[in-house]
Amino acid sequence: MKANNFKVAGWVATAAVVAFVAEIILTFMSQVPAYSEVASPRLVSLALAIHIALASYAMHRLRGFLNERFEFHRADVLIPLLVGGGIALGLAVISSRFYFEPAISAILMIMIGVPLGVVSVLFGYRLLAVNGAISGYKKPFAYIHMLAPICFLSVIFAPLGLLLLLAGQILLALMFFTDESPELEFV
């Protein structure tokens, strides 16, 4: 039996979940006048930067996980695009808090978010082809990657998109902690 080489990635993904929850709470606190001094834009941006760094590493390790455990290479190009797009979107959000007008921020988010959403949907679709259930986490993780961008594009369902992203981060951490080997396929 092979040792699980992805436990560190699982812990990093777990830390990304904690940072994501902290970021969401701080963002909401910054909108309430009584707490706006506690949750300053710098603190919210720091939480976002930590979350993005941790989540980016976890997604990067997902590529190795899929390659090593399942010999799955159909997402090798999409995962770096997701990581790069997530970093670009995070930097855009951080810089929009300090430097940009709301209209310019919205245009920037759309310019980065729409292509990132398309890549995410394609990634979710391709992930369904993995030979194995990844302890039952494959389908929910794939469907989250297909549904979350649609929620964000609808704007009305953006809070649901946030919850889906959080659930996706949790599933990613759980996938790294599994010791499942790929199912044998007889032809």
Model-based region annotation:
Residues 1-187:
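Hydrophobic, aromatic-enriched alpha-helical segments typical of multi-pass transmembrane helices
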